[in-house]
Amino acid sequence: PELGDPWHGGPKPPLYRPVPQAAPAVPSAGIEGALVPDIVVDGAEHGALTVRAASVRGDSHRYQAEPRQDSVCVARIGSGESELLVLGVADGVGSAPLSHVGSQKACALAAGALDRVAGPLAAAVAESDLPGFTALARQATAEVATLLRHEAERYGRRPSEFATTLRLLVVPLDPEVRVRGLLTLGDGGTALLREGRWDTALGATEEGDGAVIDTRTPALPTTREPVATLISTRPGDVLVVCTDGLSTPLAGDQDTARFLARAWSPERVPGPADFLWQLQYRVKSYDDDRSAVVLWEGPAR
């Protein structure tokens, strides 16, 4: 059966059609930008844990034939008792011309950096050692920032042209561990769906960790110190890490919050195609890229 167009809030849908529009052109977007897919869907299942991920080019970028600047990450790192899932999103800063490259590389570089410290990282999360987790998170993001600067040099461009946020959830695959690590740098959101209710301020801070007040969002590679948090979960919880294309309407639009609370309830995890359709719930004036990685916490074994 056909799902049809994504549902929308309000009496009328947004003006733009909810389908891919003009592709980015090589002369204007570069070869990397021209090859960024309009839509990405991913997922994984490990024991009682189920993951769905998707990233969709926003209406504004589709209309202007610009590449999607968001990226998503679903990576399995470590080995043995130190195996972890790294679930993340990166949102390329709109004013940075190569932010689509920056967001892709930030996800890949972060997974690699965390893999190199997977043993102590898994131990810090399992032991609820926030200072230890924070130190490892800062080490990893500092490495990502350095490598992004090297990429800028290789391109002959300024590091700020690769500016991107980064938001990662670190999930031990040990079923006995119910603690998750959260690493955030820049805007976006982390939400918890528990017993049908959303907590959309999970891990939120007033001004990030910057000492200087700045109206711009902190972003790699200029900012390299993340905010680190540990989250205790329960069986049946649903955790969402997302870019602000979703976090803003999820926190500010009741129709979006109600729709996704039903769609992503723990009773039935959606398949990848259904998840993509649900993620695209439309609200007028929200036309940015939209990306999310969602973790369903299965029952205790």
Predicted features along the sequence, with ranges:
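N-terminal entry segment of metal-dependent catalytic domains or homologous docking segments
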Residues: 1-112, 188
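Helix-loop-helix
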Residues: 108-150, 259-281
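Short helix/loop capping segments that flank catalytic or ligand/cofactor-binding pockets
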Residues: 96-98, 192-193, 249-251
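PP2C/PPM family metal-dependent serine/threonine protein phosphatase catalytic domain
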Residues: 55-63, 144-157, 189-229, 267-269, ...
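Acidic loop->beta-strand submotif enriched in PP2C/PPM serine/threonine phosphatases
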Residues: 66-69, 73-75, 79-81, 160-172, ...
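Catalytic core of PPM/PP2C metal-dependent serine/threonine phosphatase domains
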Residues: 124-193, 226-231
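Short beta-strand-to-coil "C-cap" segments at the C-terminal boundary of structured domains/repeats
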Residues: 171-172, 193-195, 294-301
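C-terminal catalytic subdomain
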Residues: 1-25, 210-301
